[in-house]
């Protein structure tokens, strides 16, 4: 795939399911995910191609990723137009996207899709994987979690999701359900809403959106202290903005402040709502807009349960002790055997206002199909906040109304997929509306400019790539064409070999002719 794009083939895809015998549901499910983030996506081949043939996980993954593909169609279409105009492929290798980062030169496990989405497809039997993020801020597509670039991270890769990260300063046109205003949800024809997914920039960044081959909107994201502004060079008609990974304290549209709501904005109202740190949902007034300014609010919550005291009924072996699920590591686990009495409880150390719990199960292992989550202020009197009745055994993200609690307990576990259950991580998160005492361990989004991984190092010894400015006749745009140095080297070597071969052939022909003439004379 990366070789195809480097050779100029921008429009490609795979026959999901294949013509050979797909071995199992996990391969098929991972293939679905990869196809979602390819220039075109289709199920095609021989044998059973229908997702429901491969079990509930595959079927549910197909449904969520089918709607995600529908969400992203405007962005994919725009990228295809850009590819046609400039030659810049829809899917790019990391080396092509970030030529200034030598660590990404040989990266084959991740790539950029439509310039804004870093995709790390899973090609092995894994529930977590390592990913190297270029400099700048990155936001998890599924959770909104902030990752600071320039480092390698061990990230979740449950069977129903592939790791995808949104780049800082992104402005992504999407279509979402007007009922939920969320990605991956079913879009009914009478409730489709055009929206923009945006992320806080590092310094300043521009994005082009081609709604058709002749109509272009340029969005500019620029940071100023703890505020950033998204401006358009022409009136934007999108009425919904999904600001990922942002807990906004103020939002202004064309300079006018919007009301902060305590609920998801309805179709007939304007305002903004902070959706538990995952994103801020903004519904703008009916009029077209040219600028939206977002002021960052409180800290982004980290896992309050990490390295906290955990109490449980038992554990199976020393290498699967219960402390493993709150140690912040993804390669340590806790396996529970006696489910009739299984529970675990985490002491947060102090009373917190929480509204989200995450329970992460190991793929292809036993998991908690049914269980309850309860909270307590004193460890004795418990209040149930969530009852899980049909978990799929991957990552369960459980949301509930904000509640004050010091202790969080998971109990009444029944197994799915075996007689034991294995957990590798447990998380508890503070509500976005919680008051803090200033000791929050969360992180603020740093929007300062970073060293640009997109810039080619100014050195004659660079083996990354050369950069030349090209003006294409008939196009109003000046764009940059990146030429892989190894392609040039191979071209030169190939040319030399071709010339040498031609010379050798000429010499050989002359020798044969000389021998023939000599024989005729004799």
Language model: regions and residue ranges:
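Single-pass type I membrane-protein transmembrane alpha-helix
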Residues: 498-511
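Aromatic, loop-rich ligand-recognition surfaces of beta-strand-rich domains
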Residues: 300-302, 327-386, 390-446, 466, ...
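Single-pass type I membrane protein transmembrane segment
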Residues: 487-498
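Catalytic-domain carbohydrate-binding cleft regions of carbohydrate-active enzymes
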Residues: 1-160
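Surface-exposed beta-strand/loop patches in extracellular or lumenal glycoproteins
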Residues: 125-135, 232-249
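Cytoplasmic C-terminal tails of single-pass
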Residues: 513-522
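Predominantly extracellular/luminal regions of secreted and cell-surface proteins
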Residues: 182-202, 300-327
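Catalytic cores of secreted or luminal carbohydrate-active enzymes
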Residues: 66-86, 124, 141-217
């Amino acid at each position: 795939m990366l070789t195809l794009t480097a050779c100029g083939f921008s429009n490609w895809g795979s026959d999901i399911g294949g013509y050979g015998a797909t071995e199992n549901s996990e391969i098929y499910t991972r293939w679905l995910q990869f196809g979602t983030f390819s220039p075109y996506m289709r199920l095609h081949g021989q044998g059973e191609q229908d997702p429901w043939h491969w079990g509930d996980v595959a079927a549910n993954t197909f449904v969520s990723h089918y709607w995600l593909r529908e969400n992203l169609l405007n962005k994919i279409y725009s990228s295809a137009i850009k590819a046609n105009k400039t030659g810049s492929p829809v899917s790019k290798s990391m080396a092509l996207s970030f030529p200034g980062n030598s660590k990404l030169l040989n990266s084959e496990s991740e790539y950029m899709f439509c310039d804004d989405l870093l995709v790390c497809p899973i090609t092995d039997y894994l529930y977590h994987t390592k990913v190297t993020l270029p400099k700048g801020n990155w936001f998890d597509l599924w959770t909104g979690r902030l990752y600071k670039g320039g480092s390698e991270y061990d990230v979740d890769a449950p069977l129903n999701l592939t790791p995808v990260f949104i780049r800082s300063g992104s402005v992504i046109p999407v279509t979402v359900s007007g009922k939920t205003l969320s990605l991956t949800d079913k879009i009914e024809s009478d409730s489709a809403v055009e929206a923009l997914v945006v992320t806080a920039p590092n310094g300043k960044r521009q994005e082009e959106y081609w709604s058709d081959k002749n109509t272009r909107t340029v969005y500019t994201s620029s940071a100023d202290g703890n505020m950033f502004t998204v401006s358009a060079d022409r009136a934007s008609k999108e009425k919904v903005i999904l600001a990922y990974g942002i807990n906004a304290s103020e939002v202004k549209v064309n300079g006018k402040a919007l009301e902060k709501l305590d609920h998801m904005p309805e179709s007939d109202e304007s305002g903004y709502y902070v959706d538990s740190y995952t994103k801020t949902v903004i519904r703008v007034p009916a009029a077209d807009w040219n600028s939206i300014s977002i002021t960052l609010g409180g800290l982004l919550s980290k896992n309050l349960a990490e390295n906290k005291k955990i109490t449980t009924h038992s554990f199976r072996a020393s290498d699967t002790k219960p402390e493993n699920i709150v140690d912040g590591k993804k390669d340590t686990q806790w396996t529970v055997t006696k489910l009739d009495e299984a529970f675990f409880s985490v002491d947060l150390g102090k009373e917190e206002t929480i509204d989200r719990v995450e329970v992460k199960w190991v793929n292809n292992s036993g998991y908690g199909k049914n269980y309850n989550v309860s909270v307590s202020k004193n460890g004795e009197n418990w209040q149930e906040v969530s009852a899980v009745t049909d978990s799929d055994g991957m990552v369960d993200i459980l949301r509930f109304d904000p509640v004050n609690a010091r202790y969080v307990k998971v109990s009444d576990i029944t197994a799915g997929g075996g007689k034991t259950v294995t957990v590798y991580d447990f998380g508890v998160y503070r509500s976005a509306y919680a008051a803090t005492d200033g000791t929050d361990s969360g992180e603020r989004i740093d929007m300062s400019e970073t060293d640009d991984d997109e810039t080619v190092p100014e050195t004659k010894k660079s083996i990354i790539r050369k950069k030349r400015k090209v003006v294409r006749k008939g196009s109003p745009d000046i764009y940059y064409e990146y030429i892989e140095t190894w392609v040039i080297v191979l071209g030169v070597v190939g040319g030399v070999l071709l010339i040498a071969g031609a010379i050798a052939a000429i010499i050989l022909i002359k020798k044969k002719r000389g021998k023939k003439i000599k024989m005729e004379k004799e």
